[in-house]
């Protein structure tokens, strides 16, 4: 099965960072990573994909226009079985509460702990198999 992860972040260097961190997995074809630079773009890309090939969405919270928190209920309504993990520089309790209330399964703080993220992806890959 061809599975992919959708990463949503308005920072241009995020794509290069993720491709570098997951270069072995991407080369081996374990999964694909798609990138969206805004919440509306992410909603469009997610709508073009059929479950269960989309196994995880990682989204920044602070983005111009529609924030990641504003996107959450919309993406959860369209893809209720796809977990969403929010990424933020602000890991305070209030931000975490808002993210969980709106449907996120977790919150990662920047700089991202890629070892922990890799474990999360491995779990999602096992569930998709």
Regions found by a protein language model. Give the residues of each.
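Two-component/phosphorelay signaling modules centered on CheY-like receiver
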Residues: 12-34
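Acidic, metal-coordinating helix/loop segments flanking the phosphotransfer/catalytic sites
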Residues: 19, 35-56, 77
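Active-site T/S-Asp motif of two-component receiver
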Residues: 58-60
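Receiver (REC) domain active-site loop signature in two-component systems and cognate sites
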Residues: 63
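Alpha4 helix (beta4-alpha4-beta5 surface) of REC/receiver domains from two-component response regulators
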Residues: 70, 77, 91-106, 119
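A Lys-centered signature of the CheY-like receiver
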Residues: 110
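Receiver (REC) domain switch/active-site region of two-component response regulators
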Residues: 113
């Amino acid at each position: 099965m061809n599975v992919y992860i959708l990463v949503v972040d308005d920072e241009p260097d995020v794509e290069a960072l993720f491709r570098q961190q997951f270069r072995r997995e991407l080369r081996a074809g374990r999964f694909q990573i798609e990138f969206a630079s805004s919440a509306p773009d992410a909603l469009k890309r997610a709508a073009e994909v059929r479950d269960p090939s989309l196994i995880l969405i990682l989204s920044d919270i602070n983005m111009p226009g529609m924030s990641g928190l504003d996107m959450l209920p919309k993406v959860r309504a369209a893809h209720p079985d796809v977990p969403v993990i929010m990424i933020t520089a602000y890991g305070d309790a209030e931000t975490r509460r808002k993210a969980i209330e709106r449907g996120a399964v977790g919150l990662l703080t920047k700089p991202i702990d890629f070892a922990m993220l890799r474990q999360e992806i491995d779990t999602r890959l096992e569930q998709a198999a």
